[in-house]
């Protein structure tokens, strides 16, 4: 909080993936407004207008012609909130915070409780404080049914129970913001929980690239405990390690700027060798609001795929960016192509096997064994490189295998989180084919 207030210029740049997630949340929030139409949008033109819009919001509460407000601004005890939706409910108001997720986390409850604290401080008569989120059981059938797409959860009772502790915390935070210097806080698990901190680059600037903090065999809690107890170099850390332990192998890889893998596990998992291998790259799009009849929120759509034949070097490509309803055609093509090979290798955070079962691409469970997610194989083989702790992607693994080379990998996470087809076209194009070539090279290298 102190850094956001006093040194915002030190904040790490938002990744494309994170920006896309924010965009998804915004899109869902705007759609949620149609559940309560004809509202007054209180979004200020700039931060300098917050005070003015707060005053206008308070005036609107007493205007009988205004029944709904979007992004209503309230300020209490130096704490500002922008409430997603505020709906008149008789003599009181129904406060609604919109979430684009399928379930509610503790963080969402705390967020709503803070909003209720400010509303309560502003003496707004609240009939209920609710979280509005996406119904995981909704199935599209024709036009989107906004009444079925969203579900509500009352959190007013929870929020009321949190008023005292929130007031205490707000006053503590105000004291922190008023400090002349940034509070001294050791790096630790809070850097990544519940979300990755936006000032990681600043706070971690003294941590060496080959620090034992980047290892994965120990828990983060244990690593930070050692680091903050004064053991801040690898030499001191080694005193706690078995020379033949995975931890020691990872540390050696860090210091030699190379990778580590348990080849025994790798060969057991990778299966028999064959030249009849297809390298598969599938692009998923998982829209929060289903686009196709029969689909649920966040159900994946196969929007593109690329298959590289190991033997011939030929590539088969397909996409349905212009019309997602053509996905069924692509599934048939994909099914026929995969039948030609003894082994199919892909690299993805998604479980493609489950997806293929869902769409009946795999008719026999025996076929599952020829489809291999190299990401899972490497993780289960204890693969480690200095960058893989926080980014276990084909890009970082490739850099570990081939230090003098660097690749650009289109991110499925990015593309799953955005509906921007232009972005998809720009990133996918030849990148899917190129990524398959990188996957092929990495696969062959590891088999040597």
Predicted feature residues:
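Metal-dependent nuclease catalytic cores that hydrolyze phosphodiester bonds in DNA/RNA
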Residues: 1-91, 220-253, 417-421, 434
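Short acidic-glycine loop/turn motifs at beta-strand connectors
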Residues: 88-92, 206, 309-313
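Conserved RNase H-like, two-metal-ion catalytic cores of nucleic-acid enzymes
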Residues: 74, 265-338
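Long, highly charged low-complexity segments
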Residues: 231-289
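Conserved DEDDh/DEDDy metal-dependent 3′-5′ exonuclease domain
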Residues: 67-72, 80-84, 95-98, 107-173, ...
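Helix-loop elements that line ligand-binding/catalytic pockets
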Residues: 187-194, 198-234, 268, 322-327, ...
């Amino acid at each position: 909080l102190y850094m956001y207030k006093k040194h915002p210029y030190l904040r790490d740049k938002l990744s494309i993936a994170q920006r896309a997630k924010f965009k998804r949340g915004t899109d869902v929030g705007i759609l949620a407004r149609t559940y309560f139409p004809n509202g007054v949008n209180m979004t200020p033109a700039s931060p300098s207008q917050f005070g003015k819009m707060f005053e206008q919001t308070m005036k609107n509460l007493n205007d009988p012609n205004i029944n709904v407000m979007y992004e209503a601004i309230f300020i209490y005890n130096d704490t500002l909130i922008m409430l997603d939706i505020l709906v008149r409910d008789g003599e009181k108001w129904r406060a609604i915070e919109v979430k684009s997720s399928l379930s509610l986390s503790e963080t969402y409850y705390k967020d709503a409780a803070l909003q209720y604290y400010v509303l309560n401080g502003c003496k707004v008569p609240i009939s209920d404080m609710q979280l509005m989120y996406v119904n995981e059981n909704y199935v599209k059938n024709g036009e989107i049914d906004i009444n079925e797409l969203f579900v509500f959860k009352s959190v007013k009772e929870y929020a009321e129970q949190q008023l005292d502790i929130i007031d205490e915390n707000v006053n503590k935070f105000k004291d922190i913001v008023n400090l002349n210097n940034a509070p001294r806080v050791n790096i630790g698990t809070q850097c990544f929980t519940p979300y990755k901190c936006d000032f990681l680059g600043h706070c971690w600037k003294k941590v060496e690239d080959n620090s034992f903090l980047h290892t994965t065999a120990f828990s983060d809690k244990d690593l930070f405990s050692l680091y903050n107890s004064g053991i801040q170099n690898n030499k001191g850390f080694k005193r706690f390690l078995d020379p033949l332990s995975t931890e020691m192998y990872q540390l050696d890889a860090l210091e030699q700027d190379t990778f580590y893998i348990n080849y025994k596990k790798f060969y057991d998992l990778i299966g028999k060798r064959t030249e009849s291998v297809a390298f598969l790259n599938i692009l998923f799009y998982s829209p929060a609001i289903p686009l196709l009849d029969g689909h649920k929120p966040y159900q994946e759509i196969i929007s593109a795929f690329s298959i590289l034949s190991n033997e011939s070097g030929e590539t088969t490509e397909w996409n349905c960016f212009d019309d997602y309803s053509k996905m069924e055609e692509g599934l048939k093509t994909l099914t026929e192509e995969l039948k030609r090979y003894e082994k199919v290798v892909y690299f993805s955070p998604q479980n493609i096997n489950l997806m293929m079962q869902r769409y009946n691409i795999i008719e026999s469970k025996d076929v599952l064994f020829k489809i291999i997610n190299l990401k899972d194989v490497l993780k289960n083989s204890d693969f480690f490189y200095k960058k893989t702790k926080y980014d276990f992607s084909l890009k970082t693994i490739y850099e570990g295998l081939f230090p003098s080379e660097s690749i650009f990998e289109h991110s499925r996470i990015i593309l799953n989180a955005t509906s921007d087809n232009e972005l998809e076209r720009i990133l996918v194009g030849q990148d899917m084919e190129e990524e398959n070539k990188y996957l092929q090279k990495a696969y062959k290298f590891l088999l040597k």
